[in-house]
Curated annotation (Swiss-Prot):
Native species: Synechococcus sp. (strain CC9311)
GO terms assigned for molecular function: 4 iron, 4 sulfur cluster binding; aspartic acid methylthiotransferase activity; metal ion binding; protein methylthiotransferase activity
Descriptive protein name: Ribosomal protein uS12 methylthiotransferase RimO
Residues binding [4Fe-4S] cluster 2, per UniProt: 169, 173, 176
Keywords, ordered alphabetically: 4Fe-4S, Cytoplasm, Iron, Iron-sulfur, Metal-binding, S-adenosyl-L-methionine, Transferase
Length: 470
């Protein structure tokens, strides 16, 4: 992703003059990553060179995150560091949406600000910057959602792709700034999503990850009711072996959705459930009051319908007013439910959210201690869940390969990219090695808290094992 580019104007057929290279710095979540990929695609189509190395360009587009304070600080550090190197900046993403005027005032090197609903105009913005203008392109209320027709330059490698099924969120959780930064939910049509999935299949994608703010709410704004189940069934015809769903709000996992998880062969039984807490009073303060009656019942239903389900959740400790008894309720819930993967965060007050003004804040040292206690509680559970896979032969998507040792690193279906573990793969007795982007059968022989290990299984070995089992 570097160097200059020559291009032809799609409308006139005339050659475009060589245009400069633009560097990109990406921060934040995979939803933000898709926005970055669209900006890359638009600029490449317009004839610009694009690069992930800031040294290749004088101008850097920084797609920022503003979800929590730590993310904002990382974004600001990145901006200041690039500015001190003498780079000109186009600031995009959530931080731009959140603090547009302040950023323009405090960072003279910022030549443009581009909001979360305006990145489709990146070429026009860049041309204005090249003409000497200083640009503020931020819609007060984001309404745009990209579809399969918007150019895209993927950054995740050949085998894995994220597919955004909707943008924005209609919920108003007390701790979350995202609706303010991304707007209300706006879903793409099933036909649009399936069309892009087919495009990605043709590019060699082996794992497709469906994302939005609340994926189980997909379609409510467009069709009058959620239609995730229908979408999953439609994606069953796409030639991609793994389809993974992220951000499943618990109340949206209806019997129809669980049936789609069960019945559509390429939909993985991997459920990413951001439950946040277990205690009814804390959930009420989080403006998620309906969830308290759902958590345990839903998890029982999932395990009944999907016995092989892989369960991931995220939890928040130290929410304002969280008592020791309420925290112990959460600890008991975590110990009882035995999730495969858990992300635990301390509460971060965000300006503009209801939770930022709540009384009875929990001291940082107590919140951190609670987080540490939950992590300590979860580690042996995760280790045991991983150990239960020892002896199984599973498909592993190889993502890295060391030619000198033959070792490979990949993931099986129980691990999502970046947030979960990996599988360390030895080549096997026959020395079989495969390139990244390939799926290979692996017998799992080892496990720890986070990762698995194993060796490639030959066809002859699989035949012998099948005969022995009959």
């Amino acid at each position: 992703m570097q160097g200059h580019a020559m291009a032809v104007d799609a409308k006139t057929g005339n050659s475009l003059s060589e245009r400069p290279t633009v560097a990109f710095a990406h921060l934040g979540c995979e939803k933000n990553r898709v926005d970055t990929e669209h900006m890359l695609g638009l600029l490449a189509e317009a004839g610009y060179g694009v690069s992930s190395d800031e040294n290749d360009a004088n101008l850097v587009v920084v797609n920022t995150c503003s979800f929590i304070q730590d993310a904002r600080e990382e974004s600001v550090r990145t901006l200041v560091g690039l500015a001190e190197q003498g780079k000109e900046l186009i600031i995009a993403g959530c931080l731009a949406q959140h603090f547009q005027d302040e950023l323009l005032e405090s960072i003279p090197e910022a030549k443009a600000i581009v909001g979360t609903g305006d990145y489709q105009h990146i070429v026009e913005v860049l041309q204005q910057v090249e003409a000497g203008e200083r640009v503020n392109r931020v819609s007060q209320t984001p309404t745009f959602v990209a579809d399969e027709n918007l150019p895209r330059y993927r950054t995740t490698g050949e085998a894995v792709a994220y597919l955004k099924v909707a943008e924005g969120c209609d919920y108003r959780c007390a701790f979350c700034i995202i609706p303010h930064l991304r707007g209300n939910q706006r879903s793409r049509t099933i036909e649009s999503i399936v069309a892009e999935a087919h495009q990605l299949a043709e590019q060699g994608v082996q794992e497709l990850i469906l994302i939005s703010q609340i994926t189980t709410n997909y379609g409510l704004d467009l069709y009058g009711k959620p239609r995730l189940a229908d979408l999953l069934k439609a994606l069953g015809d796409v030639e991609i072996p793994w389809i993974r769903v992220h951000y499943a709000y618990p109340t949206g996992l209806t019997p129809a959705v669980l049936a789609a998880y069960r019945d559509v062969p390429n939909v993985l039984p991997y459920l990413d459930l951001p439950l946040q807490h277990s205690h009814p009073e804390v959930l009420r303060a989080m403006n998620r009051p309906w969830q308290a009656d759902v958590n345990e019942r839903l998890l029982d239903q999932i395990r009944e319908q999907l016995p092989n389900a892989i369960l991931r959740t995220t939890l928040i400790v130290g929410f304002p007013g969280e008592t020791e008894d309420q925290f112990e309720h959460l600890a008991g819930f975590l110990e009882r439910q035995r999730f495969d993967h858990v992300g635990i965060f301390t509460f971060s007050p965000e300006d503009g959210t209801a939770a930022a003004t709540l009384p009875d804040s929990v001291p940082d040292e107590i919140a951190i201690a609670r987080k540490d206690k939950l992590m300590t509680l979860q580690q042996p559970i995760s280790a045991a869940r991983n150990a239960s896979w020892i002896g199984k032969t599973v498909d592993v998507l190889v993502e890295q390969h060391n030619p000198s040792t033959g070792e490979m690193i990949g993931r099986c279906s129980r691990f999502a990219p970046e947030v979960d573990g990996e599988v360390l793969v030895q080549p096997g007795d026959n020395g079989l090695q495969v390139n990244p982007g390939t799926m290979v059968p692996v017998q799992i022989t080892g496990a720890d808290i986070y990762d698995l290990s194993g060796h490639v299984v030959s066809a002859a070995h699989m035949v012998a094992a099948a005969r022995a089992a009959t």
